[in-house]
Amino acid sequence: MKIELAREEDREEILALYRMQIGREFCPWTEQYPGNDEITFDLSRDALFIMRDEGRIVAAISLEEDPQVDALECWTKDLQPGGELARVAVHPDYQNRGLARQMVQYGLDKLKERGYRSFHAVVNRLNEKAIRSYAVFHFNLVGECEMYDQPFYCYEKELN
């Protein structure tokens, strides 16, 4: 399987992958989010990466820019700028194979390449699967917050 930068011609397949996540446990995604606006934004910044298996898109991840998350007080000042990863999606037929971990590691490497000193993320406190995945990477729990009418943990990791 190969990870590569997404292209405009991948849009419909990525959107279909996003839609497959709706209704999954702990997934707050809807028919509106993520959608074409997020894909357009990510493509415009070369920030959307996909994993293919025999030509089929089986996973995706985005490098995110979110001023609301960046403005949280919990982030370590000496580790700025911090980058985010978002919209991690794995095709249901490929779940529980470690693909999300591979995508996150790839995203962390890309953030470092682009000059970010740290990774930071907000994760829904009820999303046990994501929390377990993040433990593998030894992300530090640095705070809690409420955003988008949901409770979140704030995680951070120095990129070195």
Regions found by a protein language model. Give the residues of each.
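Conserved acetyl-CoA-binding loop-helix of GNAT-fold acetyltransferases
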Residues: V90, N96-D109, R132-V136
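Conserved beta-strand-loop-alpha-helix junction that forms the acyl-donor binding cleft
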Residues: A121-I131, M147-P151
